[in-house]
Regions:
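C-terminal outer-membrane beta-barrel translocator/porin domains of Gram-negative envelope proteins
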Residues: 16-19, 26-170, 174-191, 223-226, ...
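C-terminal beta-signal and terminal closure region of outer-membrane beta-barrel proteins
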Residues: 187-240
C-alpha cells in the first residue's frame, strides 16, 4: 500500500507472509544452514519512504532516488531490518536538441538485519544489481563451504554512460562496483570487493522492449577468499 504525499515524495507499507522449507542440503558443515532446516513461517511487516526526482525511471540523467525501509519479522524468527538506497545522476553534456547525453551516476545500498535472521533472509552480493564481476551470490560470506550471507551490506557503484550512436540506441558505460557483505555489522579489508569494468546498453523500442539490454564486463581487483568471479553479466531491466 502506498500514498504519494508530494510529486516527489511517497510512503508505503506492506505485509509479507511466507512458509519456507529448507531440506536436503548438499553440505551439512554450516551451523547457520543447519539451524534453518525444516519449514519456517515468516510474517514480515514493513514501512518505507521514497523520494524520487529522476527525469526518467529507465535511463535517468538528472535527479536522485532515495528510499528508506524498515521491516519487522515475526513467527518462527523475530528480527528487525533496515535498508537505505540512494542513486544520484548528473548530466555532463548533451547536444543542443537534448540527445546524446553523457551522465555520471552514483549508487549506494546500506543494510542491517538482526542476528536472528535466518540464512534465506540474509544479505547476499554478486551479480548485476549488486556487485558485477562476481557470480550470483558469489561475493558473500562462507561458512563451512556454504554461502550463508550476512547481517550487513554496503554496496556502491560509480558509472559513466555515453552514447555510441547518433540515435542513442547504443550506449557505452564505464563503471566501478565496490563494497562488502559481512556476517556481522563491520567492514573488514579482507572482505572488501572492488570490480571496475565496461559495458553496453542496447535499446530496441521498435521491438517493444522498453528497458535497455545491459551487457557488462567486470574485472575484480579486490575480492575475498572463496569468492566466485564471473566477468560477463547480462540483464534486461532498470536496476542500474
Amino acid at each position: 500500500i502506498g500514498r504519494r504525499l508530494t510529486p516527489y515524495l511517497s510512503i508505503n507499507s506492506g505485509v509479507r507472509l511466507e512458509s519456507v522449507t529448507v531440506d536436503n542440503p548438499r553440505l551439512d558443515t554450516s551451523t547457520e544452514l543447519n539451524n534453518s532446516l525444516g519449514t519456517s513461517n515468516l510474517y514480515i511487516g514493513n514501512v518505507g519512504i521514497v523520494r524520487d526526482t529522476r527525469d526518467s525511471v529507465v535511463q535517468a540523467t538528472t535527479g536522485s532516488l532515495f528510499s528508506m525501509n524498515y521491516s519487522q519479522a515475526f513467527g518462527d524468527y523475530s528480527y528487525s531490518r533496515g535498508d537505505l538506497d540512494l542513486k544520484t545522476y548528473r548530466l555532463l553534456y548533451q547536444r543542443p536538441d537534448g540527445s546524446g547525453r553523457h551522465t555520471v551516476s552514483f549508487g549506494t545500498k546500506l543494510g542491517f538485519t538482526g542476528n536472528s535472521t535466518p540464512i534465506f533472509e540474509n544479505y547476499f552480493a554478486g551479480g548485476f544489481s549488486t556487485l558485477r564481476g562476481f557470480d550470483f551470490r558469489g561475493a558473500s560470506p562462507l561458512q563451512g563451504g556454504v554461502r550463508v550471507g550476512g547481517e550487513f551490506q554496503w554496496l556502491n557503484t560509480v558509472e559513466y554512460m555515453f552514447p555510441l550512436t547518433a540515435s542513442d540506441n547504443v550506449k557505452g558505460v564505464l563503471f566501478c562496483d565496490y563494497g562488502t557483505v559481512e556476517e556481522d555489522i563491520e567492514i573488514t579489508a579482507d572482505n572488501f570487493r572492488v570490480a571496475p569494468g565496461f559495458g553496453f546498453r542496447l535499446s530496441m523500442p521498435g521491438a517493444g522492449i522498453g528497458a535497455p539490454l545491459a551487457f557488462d564486463f567486470a574485472f575484480p581487483v579486490a575480492s575475498a577468499a572463496g569468492d566466485d568471479e564471473k566477468i560477463f553479466s547480462f540483464y534486461l531491466g532498470v536496476l542500474r
